[in-house]
Amino acid sequence: MSEEGGVEVKLLKPRKPLPDVGEIVVGTVQEVHDYGAYLILDEYGGVRAFLPWSEIASRAVRNIHAVLKPRQKVVVKVIRVYKKRGQVDVSLKRVMDSEKKRKMMFYKRYLKAATLVELIAEKLGKSVDEAYREVLWKLEDAYGDPMKGLEAAVLQGREALEKAGVPEEWIEPLLETAKTHVRVKTVKITFYLTLRSMAGDGVERVRKVLEAAKSQIESFKDSKVVARIYTVGAPKYRVELQGYNYKTLEKALEKMVEAARKTASKLGVEFSFERED
Protein backbone atom coordinates (compact mmCIF):
# COMPACT_ATOMS: atom_id res chain seq x y z
CA MET A 1 0.00 0.00 0.00
CA SER A 2 1.35 3.43 -0.91
CA GLU A 3 0.17 6.98 -0.40
CA GLU A 4 1.12 9.40 -3.17
CA GLY A 5 -0.08 12.98 -3.04
CA GLY A 6 -2.82 12.04 -0.59
CA VAL A 7 -4.05 9.21 -2.83
CA GLU A 8 -3.76 5.80 -1.14
CA VAL A 9 -3.19 3.02 -3.67
CA LYS A 10 -2.57 -0.73 -3.43
CA LEU A 11 0.38 -1.12 -5.80
CA LEU A 12 1.26 -4.29 -7.65
CA LYS A 13 4.89 -5.29 -8.07
CA PRO A 14 6.02 -4.87 -11.70
CA ARG A 15 8.07 -7.39 -13.66
CA LYS A 16 9.71 -4.52 -15.56
CA PRO A 17 10.37 -0.91 -14.47
CA LEU A 18 8.22 0.82 -17.11
CA PRO A 19 5.35 -0.16 -19.43
CA ASP A 20 5.82 -0.29 -23.19
CA VAL A 21 4.37 2.17 -25.70
CA GLY A 22 0.92 0.91 -26.71
CA GLU A 23 0.40 -1.02 -23.47
CA ILE A 24 -2.98 -0.75 -21.71
CA VAL A 25 -2.55 0.00 -18.00
CA VAL A 26 -4.58 0.89 -14.92
CA GLY A 27 -3.94 4.18 -13.17
CA THR A 28 -5.23 6.12 -10.18
CA VAL A 29 -5.80 9.84 -10.69
CA GLN A 30 -3.52 11.78 -8.36
CA GLU A 31 -3.81 15.43 -9.44
CA VAL A 32 -6.16 17.18 -11.86
CA HIS A 33 -5.16 20.46 -13.53
CA ASP A 34 -6.62 22.50 -16.38
CA TYR A 35 -3.89 21.25 -18.73
CA GLY A 36 -4.14 17.55 -17.82
CA ALA A 37 -3.87 15.06 -14.98
CA TYR A 38 -1.18 13.10 -13.18
CA LEU A 39 -1.74 9.42 -12.45
CA ILE A 40 -0.09 6.66 -10.47
CA LEU A 41 0.24 3.43 -12.44
CA ASP A 42 -1.06 0.76 -10.07
CA GLU A 43 0.66 -2.14 -11.87
CA TYR A 44 4.05 -0.43 -12.00
CA GLY A 45 4.81 0.27 -8.37
CA GLY A 46 3.58 3.85 -8.48
CA VAL A 47 5.28 5.07 -11.68
CA ARG A 48 3.99 8.56 -12.43
CA ALA A 49 2.10 9.17 -15.68
CA PHE A 50 0.87 12.35 -17.33
CA LEU A 51 -2.49 12.42 -19.11
CA PRO A 52 -2.58 15.51 -21.40
CA TRP A 53 -5.82 17.46 -21.71
CA SER A 54 -5.90 16.62 -25.46
CA GLU A 55 -5.82 12.86 -24.71
CA ILE A 56 -8.80 12.74 -22.35
CA ALA A 57 -11.66 12.44 -24.83
CA SER A 58 -12.29 12.38 -28.59
CA ARG A 59 -14.63 15.35 -28.28
CA ALA A 60 -13.72 18.65 -26.69
CA VAL A 61 -13.76 18.68 -22.89
CA ARG A 62 -14.69 22.05 -21.44
CA ASN A 63 -14.20 21.13 -17.81
CA ILE A 64 -11.56 18.50 -17.08
CA HIS A 65 -12.64 18.40 -13.43
CA ALA A 66 -16.04 17.07 -14.50
CA VAL A 67 -14.36 14.10 -16.20
CA LEU A 68 -11.50 13.26 -13.84
CA LYS A 69 -11.32 13.33 -10.06
CA PRO A 70 -8.60 12.39 -7.57
CA ARG A 71 -8.65 8.70 -6.52
CA GLN A 72 -10.54 7.72 -9.69
CA LYS A 73 -9.39 4.50 -11.38
CA VAL A 74 -8.88 4.81 -15.14
CA VAL A 75 -7.70 2.52 -17.93
CA VAL A 76 -5.26 4.28 -20.26
CA LYS A 77 -2.90 3.55 -23.15
CA VAL A 78 0.80 4.41 -22.94
CA ILE A 79 1.74 6.80 -25.76
CA ARG A 80 5.25 7.92 -24.71
CA VAL A 81 7.91 6.51 -22.37
CA TYR A 82 10.70 8.62 -20.81
CA LYS A 83 13.13 5.98 -19.54
CA LYS A 84 15.66 8.39 -18.04
CA ARG A 85 12.99 10.20 -16.03
CA GLY A 86 11.05 7.03 -15.24
CA GLN A 87 7.80 8.62 -16.42
CA VAL A 88 5.23 8.02 -19.15
CA ASP A 89 2.50 9.88 -21.02
CA VAL A 90 -0.85 8.17 -21.43
CA SER A 91 -4.11 8.54 -23.32
CA LEU A 92 -7.65 7.91 -22.15
CA LYS A 93 -9.39 8.50 -25.47
CA ARG A 94 -7.37 5.86 -27.35
CA VAL A 95 -8.72 3.00 -25.22
CA MET A 96 -11.83 1.23 -26.51
CA ASP A 97 -14.66 0.36 -24.12
CA SER A 98 -14.04 -3.36 -24.62
CA GLU A 99 -10.36 -2.88 -23.72
CA LYS A 100 -11.30 -0.94 -20.59
CA LYS A 101 -13.67 -3.64 -19.42
CA ARG A 102 -11.22 -6.46 -20.14
CA LYS A 103 -8.27 -4.68 -18.52
CA MET A 104 -10.16 -3.66 -15.38
CA MET A 105 -11.41 -7.21 -14.90
CA PHE A 106 -7.87 -8.58 -15.27
CA TYR A 107 -6.53 -5.97 -12.84
CA LYS A 108 -9.15 -6.68 -10.18
CA ARG A 109 -8.52 -10.42 -10.40
CA TYR A 110 -4.76 -9.90 -10.21
CA LEU A 111 -5.20 -7.58 -7.23
CA LYS A 112 -7.28 -10.18 -5.37
CA ALA A 113 -4.75 -12.92 -6.09
CA ALA A 114 -1.88 -10.68 -4.94
CA THR A 115 -3.70 -9.79 -1.72
CA LEU A 116 -4.35 -13.46 -0.89
CA VAL A 117 -0.79 -14.56 -1.69
CA GLU A 118 0.75 -11.69 0.28
CA LEU A 119 -1.30 -12.70 3.34
CA ILE A 120 0.03 -16.24 3.03
CA ALA A 121 3.57 -14.88 2.62
CA GLU A 122 3.24 -13.01 5.91
CA LYS A 123 2.21 -16.22 7.71
CA LEU A 124 5.13 -18.10 6.15
CA GLY A 125 7.60 -15.36 7.04
CA LYS A 126 8.16 -14.60 3.37
CA SER A 127 8.68 -11.19 1.76
CA VAL A 128 6.41 -9.58 -0.82
CA ASP A 129 9.19 -10.05 -3.39
CA GLU A 130 9.20 -13.79 -2.67
CA ALA A 131 5.40 -13.91 -2.95
CA TYR A 132 5.60 -12.52 -6.47
CA ARG A 133 8.68 -14.44 -7.57
CA GLU A 134 7.71 -17.83 -6.14
CA VAL A 135 3.94 -17.77 -6.65
CA LEU A 136 2.23 -14.91 -8.50
CA TRP A 137 4.56 -14.70 -11.49
CA LYS A 138 4.75 -18.49 -11.79
CA LEU A 139 0.95 -18.72 -11.85
CA GLU A 140 0.78 -15.87 -14.35
CA ASP A 141 3.28 -17.62 -16.64
CA ALA A 142 1.43 -20.94 -16.42
CA TYR A 143 -2.16 -19.70 -16.62
CA GLY A 144 -1.98 -16.15 -18.03
CA ASP A 145 -3.54 -14.78 -14.84
CA PRO A 146 -2.62 -15.74 -11.24
CA MET A 147 -6.28 -15.93 -10.26
CA LYS A 148 -6.81 -18.57 -12.96
CA GLY A 149 -4.04 -20.50 -11.27
CA LEU A 150 -5.82 -20.31 -7.91
CA GLU A 151 -9.09 -21.34 -9.58
CA ALA A 152 -7.29 -24.31 -11.12
CA ALA A 153 -6.04 -25.20 -7.63
CA VAL A 154 -9.64 -25.28 -6.38
CA LEU A 155 -10.62 -27.66 -9.19
CA GLN A 156 -7.48 -29.80 -9.59
CA GLY A 157 -5.75 -29.60 -6.23
CA ARG A 158 -2.00 -29.46 -5.69
CA GLU A 159 -1.27 -30.68 -9.24
CA ALA A 160 -2.31 -27.27 -10.62
CA LEU A 161 0.26 -25.52 -8.41
CA GLU A 162 3.02 -28.08 -8.97
CA LYS A 163 2.53 -27.74 -12.73
CA ALA A 164 3.26 -24.00 -12.41
CA GLY A 165 6.45 -24.68 -10.43
CA VAL A 166 5.21 -23.30 -7.10
CA PRO A 167 7.56 -24.38 -4.25
CA GLU A 168 6.26 -27.13 -1.96
CA GLU A 169 6.11 -24.94 1.17
CA TRP A 170 3.47 -22.73 -0.49
CA ILE A 171 1.17 -25.47 -1.77
CA GLU A 172 -0.89 -26.45 1.27
CA PRO A 173 -1.44 -22.83 2.46
CA LEU A 174 -2.43 -21.85 -1.10
CA LEU A 175 -4.88 -24.75 -1.41
CA GLU A 176 -6.47 -23.93 1.94
CA THR A 177 -6.80 -20.23 1.09
CA ALA A 178 -8.07 -20.87 -2.45
CA LYS A 179 -10.79 -23.24 -1.25
CA THR A 180 -11.96 -20.63 1.27
CA HIS A 181 -11.67 -17.40 -0.71
CA VAL A 182 -11.77 -18.27 -4.42
CA ARG A 183 -15.14 -18.85 -6.04
CA VAL A 184 -15.05 -20.54 -9.44
CA LYS A 185 -17.99 -19.53 -11.63
CA THR A 186 -20.07 -22.45 -12.88
CA VAL A 187 -21.75 -22.73 -16.29
CA LYS A 188 -24.68 -24.87 -17.40
CA ILE A 189 -26.00 -26.56 -20.55
CA THR A 190 -29.52 -27.97 -20.80
CA PHE A 191 -30.89 -30.44 -23.33
CA TYR A 192 -33.86 -32.77 -23.71
CA LEU A 193 -34.16 -36.45 -24.59
CA THR A 194 -37.44 -37.87 -25.86
CA LEU A 195 -37.60 -41.64 -25.34
CA ARG A 196 -40.53 -43.88 -26.30
CA SER A 197 -40.99 -47.65 -26.10
CA MET A 198 -44.16 -49.63 -26.72
CA ALA A 199 -42.61 -52.86 -25.37
CA GLY A 200 -43.99 -54.53 -22.27
CA ASP A 201 -40.81 -53.62 -20.37
CA GLY A 202 -40.63 -50.18 -22.00
CA VAL A 203 -40.10 -48.36 -18.70
CA GLU A 204 -37.07 -50.51 -17.94
CA ARG A 205 -35.65 -49.97 -21.44
CA VAL A 206 -35.98 -46.18 -21.14
CA ARG A 207 -34.30 -46.34 -17.73
CA LYS A 208 -31.34 -48.19 -19.28
CA VAL A 209 -31.01 -45.53 -21.98
CA LEU A 210 -30.89 -42.78 -19.33
CA GLU A 211 -28.37 -44.75 -17.27
CA ALA A 212 -26.17 -45.22 -20.33
CA ALA A 213 -26.20 -41.47 -20.90
CA LYS A 214 -25.42 -40.57 -17.29
CA SER A 215 -22.61 -43.17 -17.04
CA GLN A 216 -20.57 -41.07 -19.49
CA ILE A 217 -20.11 -38.38 -16.84
CA GLU A 218 -17.70 -40.64 -14.95
CA SER A 219 -14.98 -39.83 -17.49
CA PHE A 220 -15.40 -36.12 -16.64
CA LYS A 221 -15.07 -36.64 -12.89
CA ASP A 222 -11.77 -34.73 -12.69
CA SER A 223 -13.41 -31.75 -14.44
CA LYS A 224 -16.15 -31.64 -11.77
CA VAL A 225 -18.98 -32.05 -14.31
CA VAL A 226 -22.35 -32.83 -12.73
CA ALA A 227 -25.35 -34.25 -14.62
CA ARG A 228 -28.95 -34.12 -13.41
CA ILE A 229 -31.88 -35.76 -15.20
CA TYR A 230 -35.49 -34.71 -14.59
CA THR A 231 -38.75 -36.09 -15.95
CA VAL A 232 -40.57 -33.28 -17.73
CA GLY A 233 -43.42 -35.61 -18.49
CA ALA A 234 -43.01 -38.96 -20.23
CA PRO A 235 -41.61 -39.41 -22.81
CA LYS A 236 -39.54 -36.21 -22.36
CA TYR A 237 -36.55 -35.87 -20.02
CA ARG A 238 -34.62 -32.73 -19.15
CA VAL A 239 -30.85 -33.09 -18.69
CA GLU A 240 -28.77 -30.37 -16.99
CA LEU A 241 -24.98 -30.38 -17.20
CA GLN A 242 -23.07 -28.15 -14.81
CA GLY A 243 -19.33 -27.51 -14.74
CA TYR A 244 -16.65 -24.86 -14.98
CA ASN A 245 -16.22 -24.35 -18.72
CA TYR A 246 -18.41 -24.74 -21.79
CA LYS A 247 -15.84 -26.67 -23.81
CA THR A 248 -15.83 -29.54 -21.30
CA LEU A 249 -19.63 -29.50 -21.04
CA GLU A 250 -19.96 -29.71 -24.82
CA LYS A 251 -17.76 -32.82 -24.85
CA ALA A 252 -19.82 -34.35 -22.04
CA LEU A 253 -23.04 -33.57 -23.93
CA GLU A 254 -21.74 -35.27 -27.09
CA LYS A 255 -20.78 -38.41 -25.19
CA MET A 256 -24.08 -38.58 -23.31
CA VAL A 257 -26.19 -38.13 -26.43
CA GLU A 258 -24.16 -40.68 -28.41
CA ALA A 259 -24.41 -43.26 -25.60
CA ALA A 260 -28.15 -42.68 -25.30
CA ARG A 261 -28.61 -42.94 -29.08
CA LYS A 262 -26.70 -46.24 -29.34
CA THR A 263 -28.45 -47.80 -26.34
CA ALA A 264 -31.87 -46.68 -27.58
CA SER A 265 -31.17 -48.22 -31.00
CA LYS A 266 -30.04 -51.47 -29.41
CA LEU A 267 -33.14 -51.70 -27.17
CA GLY A 268 -35.64 -50.58 -29.78
CA VAL A 269 -36.43 -47.29 -28.02
CA GLU A 270 -37.52 -44.33 -30.15
CA PHE A 271 -34.98 -41.53 -29.59
CA SER A 272 -34.78 -37.79 -30.26
CA PHE A 273 -32.52 -35.04 -28.92
CA GLU A 274 -33.11 -31.30 -28.56
CA ARG A 275 -30.96 -28.51 -27.07
CA GLU A 276 -32.33 -25.64 -25.05
CA ASP A 277 -31.53 -22.22 -26.52
From Swiss-Prot:
InterPro entries: NA-bd_OB-fold (IPR012340), S1_domain (IPR003029), S1_IF2_alpha (IPR044126), TIF2_asu_arc (IPR022964), TIF2_asu_C (IPR024055), TIF2_asu_middle_sf (IPR024054), TIF_2_asu (IPR011488). GO terms for molecular function: ribosome binding; RNA binding; translation initiation factor activity. eIF-2 functions in the early steps of protein synthesis by forming a ternary complex with GTP and initiator tRNA. Gene3D superfamilies: EIF_2_alpha, Nucleic acid-binding proteins, Translation initiation factor 2, subunit 1, domain 2. The keyword Iron-sulfur does not apply. It comes from the Archaea. The lineage of its organism: Archaea, Thermoproteota, Thermoprotei, Desulfurococcales, Desulfurococcaceae. It comes from Aeropyrum pernix (strain ATCC 700893 / DSM 11879 / JCM 9820 / NBRC 100138 / K1). Residues 22-93 form the S1 motif domain. This is Translation initiation factor 2 subunit alpha.
